[in-house]
């Protein structure tokens, strides 16, 4: 009778050890080769690209494939990325660098223009000219004119919104309960 519980304990222990060794490892896929035995010790995480800034949460979410996002009241915190201050500093001109040059989604994400350059500002100048780093206004009048155009656009949208709300909506007779 003593042999049966011992056998079950041995099986359970072997199963636990097998599961513990495979914990956290991603199955080998054609895009991601299986990690070498040396790499397993350092626990490399699969990622699609490498962000130039930890503060760019959208980039971190896009690039790191196996992080867990936890919603906290003030911010969304990524867990499983290690200690950000220990990461070596980079001065990348782009938002991120792709691991694979054949990944079109990554190339589109990493090399697209930042939001500030993509915003359309009323005026004759292109958005890239308006939001260029280090640019100074040639005169106070030019800045004032840009602000007036923005204000006029906001007022125009507000009036259109008010007019849309004022339009009478068709009244349908209420259905009586029977």
From Swiss-Prot:
Keywords: Cleavage on pair of basic residues, Disulfide bond, Secreted, Signal, Vasoactive, Vasoconstrictor. One of its GO terms (cellular component) is extracellular space. PROSITE patterns: ENDOTHELIN (PS00270). InterPro entries: Endothelin (IPR020475), Endothelin_toxin_CS (IPR019764), Endothln-like_toxin (IPR001928). GO terms for biological process: angiogenesis; artery smooth muscle contraction; axon extension; cell tip growth; cytokine-mediated signaling pathway; endothelial cell migration; energy homeostasis; intracellular calcium ion homeostasis. Residues 158-178 are annotated as: Disordered. It is found in: Secreted. It comes from the Eukaryota. Its main location: secreted. Residues 1-24 form the signal peptide. The record marks 69-70 as: Cleavage. One of its GO terms (molecular function) is hormone activity. The keyword Secreted applies. Disulfide bonds join 49-63, 51-59. Belongs to the endothelin/sarafotoxin family. Endothelins are endothelium-derived vasoconstrictor peptides. PANTHER family: ENDOTHELIN, ENDOTHELIN-2. This is Endothelin-2. It comes from Mustela putorius furo (European domestic ferret).
């Amino acid at each position: 009778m003593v042999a049966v519980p011992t056998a079950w304990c041995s099986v359970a222990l072997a199963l636990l050890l097998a599961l513990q060794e495979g914990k956290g490892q991603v199955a080998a896929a054609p895009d991601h080769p299986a990690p070498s035995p040396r790499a397993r010790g350092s626990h490399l995480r699969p990622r699609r690209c490498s962000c130039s800034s930890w503060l760019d949460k959208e980039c971190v979410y896009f690039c790191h494939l196996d992080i867990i996002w936890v919603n906290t009241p003030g911010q969304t915190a990524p867990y499983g990325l290690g200690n950000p201050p220990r990461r070596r500093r980079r001065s990348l001109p782009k938002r991120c660098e792709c691991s694979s040059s054949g990944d079109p989604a990554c190339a589109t994400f990493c090399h697209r223009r930042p939001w500030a350059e993509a915003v359309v500002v009323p005026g004759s100048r292109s958005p890239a000219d308006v939001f260029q780093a280090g640019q100074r206004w040639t005169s106070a009048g030019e800045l004032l004119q840009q602000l007036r155009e923005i204000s006029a656009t906001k007022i125009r949208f507000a009036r259109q919104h008010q007019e849309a709300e004022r339009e009478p909506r068709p009244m349908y007779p209420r259905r009586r309960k029977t």
